[in-house]
């Protein structure tokens, strides 16, 4: 792998020779494969997906696999039993459990596509919490909506808006997850296109865009509320420097979370702040920077869920919110796919037929399948391994 010269010079300098050598070695190795179990749909303690069962230590439901199975051909993936997610990004699970408290809260995941951090955070949030999962780019928002629908949890709303739209809507949240767009240095191992697109000019553009995004959304975080700021890049301009800029210019204090030495998380490379860096060759995952800030001010009140929904319905583009209304064709009522995916569906409404692997794959290919003659007539809910 040939890295851009400017990137190599800067990164070697900020990491130091020993860390940089380990980092380069990590980039030459195959990226680990990891998944996260959906605890709302399956028994997380007993389900087995793929080969190997090494736990991701900073995520309650995260697992490393010994290889990369053909996920596309696993009906359990399509039913939302698990989510294929890079292990470092699962650190949000640990952060939520450590800092978000034990009472139901309202959270905004600002730059959420494709949905890994949203669904991971929701698995860790106190029951009764609500999460708005937002993505401003329409095609990415549709992928996000598909993954949130598949996850099946209630109290998750998908929107297609820019941070300024939330600001205009005057919505206030207890916590905001800001996994901001970045120069993508943490994706070098997985995507050679990220190397080709990298430049010092792009780093500068990303740094400025990140500040704009956080500034636009800051009024939507209640006084005393928590912001999780993260990127998938390594340079300090987008990471430590921006985090310190948020604290100084917008008004916030840093929060430290406990970690274990064996997790091999690297602290801040510059400045005096608690930060959590996942570096290939050091920690088992891709590149990630994360830090946690608490907004200045006496602990304020976030909007109640009912008011958040009212504001969203009036001022935002909601593209998914629980079970969609059925389609009516003449005298026939056709349920929406979201009803089949939801854990809140009325299980007595439609009879259930559990199908085998061959039938499930045929269904996923949009092929007609034939059920047993004893199967109920009319609309039935198809499951695979009872999911």
Where are the model-predicted features located?
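Conserved class I S-adenosyl-L-methionine
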Residues: 103-113
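Short beta-strand element of Class I
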Residues: 107, 128-134
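Mobile active-site "lid"/loop adjacent to the S-adenosyl-L-methionine
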Residues: 139, 174-215, 228, 232-240
């Amino acid at each position: 792998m040939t890295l851009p010269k400017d990137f190599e010079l800067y990164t070697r300098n900020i990491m130091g020779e020993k860390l940089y050598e380990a980092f380069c070695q990590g980039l030459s190795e195959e990226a680990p494969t990891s998944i996260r179990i959906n605890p709302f749909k399956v028994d997380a303690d007993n389900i087995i997906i793929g080969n190997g069962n090494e736990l991701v230590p900073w995520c309650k439901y995260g697992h490393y696999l010994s290889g990369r199975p053909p996920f596309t051909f696993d009906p359990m993936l399509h039913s939302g039993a698990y989510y294929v997610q890079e292990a470092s990004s699962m650190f949000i699970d640990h952060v939520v459990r450590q800092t978000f408290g034990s009472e139901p809260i309202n959270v905004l995941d600002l730059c959420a596509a494709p949905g890994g951090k949203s669904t991971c955070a929701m698995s860790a949030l106190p029951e009764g919490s609500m999460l708005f999962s937002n993505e401003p780019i329409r095609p990415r928002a549709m992928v996000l909506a598909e993954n949130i629908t598949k996850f099946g949890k209630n109290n998750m709303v998908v929107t297609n808006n820019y941070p300024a739209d939330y600001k205009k809507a005057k919505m206030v949240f207890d916590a905001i997850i800001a996994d901001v767009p970045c120069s993508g240095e943490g994706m070098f191992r997985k995507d050679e296109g990220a190397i080709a697109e990298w430049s010092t000019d792009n780093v500068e553009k990303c740094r400025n865009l990140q500040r704009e995004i956080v500034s636009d959304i800051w009024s939507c975080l209640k006084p005393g509320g928590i912001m999780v700021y993260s990127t998938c890049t390594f340079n300090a301009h987008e990471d430590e420097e921006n985090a310190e800029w948020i604290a100084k210019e917008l008004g916030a204090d840093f929060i430290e979370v406990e970690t274990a030495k064996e997790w091999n998380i690297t602290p801040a490379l510059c400045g005096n702040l608690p930060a959590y860096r996942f570096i290939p060759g050091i920690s088992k995952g891709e590149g990630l920077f994360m830090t946690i800030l608490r907004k200045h001010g006496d602990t304020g009140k976030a909007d109640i869920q009912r008011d958040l929904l009212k504001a969203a319905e009036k001022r935002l583009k909601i593209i998914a919110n629980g079970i969609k209304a059925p389609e009516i064709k003449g005298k026939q009522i056709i349920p929406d796919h979201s009803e089949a995916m939801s854990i809140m569906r009325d299980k007595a409404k439609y009879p259930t037929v559990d199908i085998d692997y061959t039938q499930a794959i045929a269904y996923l290919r949009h092929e007609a399948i034939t059920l047993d003659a004893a199967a109920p007539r009319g609309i039935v809910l198809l499951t695979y391994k009872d999911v």
